[in-house]
């Protein structure tokens, strides 16, 4: 008598005993809504008052483009956007949607700082941050 059918039955039973993965399923296909939200925020930032033409210094750029600081920087922008009543709530509503997409790695440095109630500083830095966020999401979206 062959043990082949018994082996199949044992494999089937073992397969049923494997614990299921917990958490959200990982999908490489991000909905287009996230890229649309980035564009909506950029449009709000480009409206009047016109954004400051003053360039960011190299340390600020590095801080905004650092992948390990994406989540801490998002927290800073969420907090700062609540201080700007006109567009702040709309920006905050869009930005908070990115929280579940960003990992919380050990940051390599301090998050960005934004001058208190300074719309121009907020605009300049958020535009560069959105560029980094878009790059991160595009990379994550590639198969």
Curated annotation (Swiss-Prot):
One of its GO terms (molecular function) is growth factor activity. Disulfide bonds: none annotated. It comes from the Eukaryota. It is found in: Secreted. Residues 1-23 form the signal peptide. GO terms for biological process: immune response; interleukin-3-mediated signaling pathway; positive regulation of cell population proliferation. Glycans are attached at residue 79. InterPro entries: 4_helix_cytokine-like_core (IPR009079), IL-3 (IPR002183). One of its GO terms (cellular component) is extracellular space. Pfam families: IL3. Keywords: Cytokine, Glycoprotein, Growth factor, Secreted, Signal. SUPFAM superfamilies: 4-helical cytokines (SSF47266). Monomer. PANTHER family: INTERLEUKIN-3. Belongs to the IL-3 family. Granulocyte/macrophage colony-stimulating factors are cytokines that act in hematopoiesis by controlling the production, differentiation, and function of 2 related white cell populations of the blood, the granulocytes and the monocytes-macrophages. This is Interleukin-3. The lineage of its organism: Eukaryota, Metazoa, Chordata, Craniata, Vertebrata. The gene is IL3.
